[in-house]
Each structure stands twice: as structure tokens, then as C-alpha cells.
């Protein structure tokens, strides 16, 4: 229904509608869906590609799910030949559903340092049929790391980082927030947890959305599209992310689209934006602390840097409004305030020529 409405409203270029008229049309639609729609309306690429493979991701309300498995046994399963079978319980159209799924652990760092293991989920076609998973049968499930006080706020901050990137670039991984009832099945007893998490779509689905392909080999960052590479470097600077490498595809994928190589990031937990306690004192491969905000990128034409800088300045209000939508979702006000201060510091740098040149432009390799 929403899809057809957007088709009528936006895809004919000769039709111009004022914002208030669109809002009247959408006033019965939940706020987060309206926000998603307006993001799509601002980009032809977003509008054309968001609705491919979207039965799970078009609805941005948190999806309630239930999982039961042994976290300890899952940690032993690290490849597709040793999948753990269980059931996924969820609610679809106000009805309780369950499907068979296969799980394996993912993420080297988190498997070593976290209580909750990140999960890759695979669903057989026959099991996913007639469910919201029919178009997305391979997914990443992101869970909190530790069972500590900040676990849900940390995962929410990481989720928000994905939503910021949706504003910044049309090339992104779709996400869906989750409310998870998880039972850790141990030998002697069972332990139950109520967690916040989210699904990330599979990279093959991203490629299909753009009628493109994922590049798996190592490629020099200088061979990648100038604007999209610098755009990603600015985003990583915004969230304080130094735990990535486009060349080695560490916490990122490369999309070959219209003869351009475009980097797409994921995994934003070890960042200054989230600042999890389990990251304190740990350094990355470059020797940077995960608490530091450092610009990592290669030198490009000054015009590219100026274009990206203006891009972020233009989007400032939209980013701020999007982030503020999630304020009521935080369990602790301090977590939200620290995140907003971190975002504010980024724009203080971007809006100050001296700071911008010394902390961004001069740091390019």
C-alpha cells in the first residue's frame, strides 16, 4: 500500500507536491515509516531500489522474535558445514509464527570477547515461504556483546549509525530492529534474556537491489569511486570508526555498480559513537584506540573533499532529526546525551575551517 502510494507521489518527475500535502496523505502511517519514506523520496536510487527484497525491511517497527539455543555450542560452529538448527518464533500480521532456521557464529572479535555471539541465520526456501523472510533467507543477527547495564543502549546506538548512513548514502545494508526473547540452553539450567538487536540484510541482496555484484578480491582504495570513498571516510570519522579497511574488506563490502567500485560499511560497535566498555584499552591494526576519533582515508582532489563536506553540512538537520527520533528508546539518558555530544563535536569540526583542515584534510594519506 505504501509502495503504491510512493509510486504515485514521486516517480513521475513532472509531479511536484508540497511537503504538507504528503504529510496529510501519510498521517495514518507510523512516524518511523514516514521518516523512511521521506529519505527515499530524496533519492531516485533509493526509491528505485529500496522496495526490492523488502518484505522484512519495509516495516521499521521493532520485530518481536524468540530464539532458544546454546550460546556455548553456537560458538563452536564457525562455518556453514556446522550449522546449528533451531526454531525462530516471531509475530507476523498479529499472528504467532515459527520457522526452522540454521545458525552459525560470526565475528572473530565478538566470539572471543562477548557473551552473546553474533549470529548468521539461514532459512530454507520452503520454510520461509509465505513469511516476511521469503525474500531474505540469509541474515546477520546483531546482539549485544556483554550482559551489562548498557547492553541495549549500545546496540541501539549501533543501529542508529546504520540509519545515519542510509541518509548519507544510497548504498547501504538494510536493517530491522528486534525485540528478542532469548533462552540460553545450558546443560544444568536455562537462562532467559530480553535483548535489543537487529537484522542486517545479506550482501548478495544488496547486489541484487542494484543489479550489480559484490567484489571479493583485494582492491586498492584509490581504484574506488572518489566521492563514495571519501563519503565513507567522513562517516567513519563521524562515528569514530577506525576498525575498517576498504582494501581488505574488513567490516565492509565492495559493490561493483555502473563501472564504479563502491565501499559499503557494517559493524559499528567498536567506535567512539558506541564506546562500549569491552573496547576500552583495545587498539586496532593501526595502533589507534577505539576511543579516538581519527580520519582514515586517501588523498583525493580538493573538489571531492569540498563536495563531501557540503554534503554533510546540507544533511545536518536531517541527521539530527533522525537521531532524535530514538531518544525515547534509550534506557539511560546519559547514553543518549553522550551520543548527541559526539555528533555535535563532528559538526563543530566540519564547520570550522581550521579544525576541518587539520583533523580531516591533512590526515589523508
Model-flagged regions — what are they?
Residues 48-365:
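Phosphate/dinucleotide-binding and metal-coordinating scaffold of catalytic cores
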Residues 3-48:
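Bacterial Sec-dependent N-terminal signal peptides
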